[in-house]
Amino acid sequence: MPVGTRRHTSTHFTPVEVAVEAAQFLCGGAWENPKILDVGSGMGKFCLVGGAMFEQAHFTGVEQRKSLCDVADQLLEYSELNNVGFLCGNIMNVKFSDFQGVYLYNPFYEHLQPFSAMDETIELDADYYEIYCGYVRKQLQRMPKNTRVVTYFGGGEEIPLNYDLVKQGFHNDLKCWQRR
């Protein structure tokens, strides 16, 4: 784990029990072999848990921080899962149309609360929060019927009006959405 990251585990990284429930919802939809996108995947816990649970699905994590991408790649190599992959880059370079499900653990929050930043490797700005949420919302709006999205924490700014909230859990912090 990168230096300084451990103190952020409860704030920035998905608890295993949340990953299990989120993966179950995302893989339980209309697609036989769903492709799931994890936005802001960090060290890849959600993707690795989901990939271990659902061999027929494929999980892709996208993360901006190279140090976290490196850890995710190491964990993936150790896990020997062949249905998980990680991209190191910006979410605005990802085509959501390649996926049938999306997992969002409040990936842009630190742009609003710089004091909660994990490190100083990416530029933080409240404008980026709006830009990234807007990009995700537009991408989700264009997705086909039955696309599934799970949000953990966050205010749901990324969720377009053409999605229904179909399930909640973990004190209503976990929300499961489906495209109409």
Placement of each model-derived feature along the sequence:
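S-adenosyl-L-methionine
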Residues: 1-31, 71-98
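Conserved class I S-adenosyl-L-methionine
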Residues: 32-42
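C-terminal substrate-binding/active-site "lid" region of AdoMet-derived donor-dependent transferases
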Residues: 111-179
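Conserved short alpha-helix immediately C-terminal to the canonical SAM/SAH-binding motif I
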Residues: 67-68
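A short SAM/SAH-binding and catalytic strip from SAM-dependent methyltransferases
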Residues: 99-115
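Conserved SAM-binding loop of SAM-dependent methyltransferases across substrates and taxa
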Residues: 45-56
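Conserved SAM-binding motif I beta-strand of class I
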Residues: 58-63
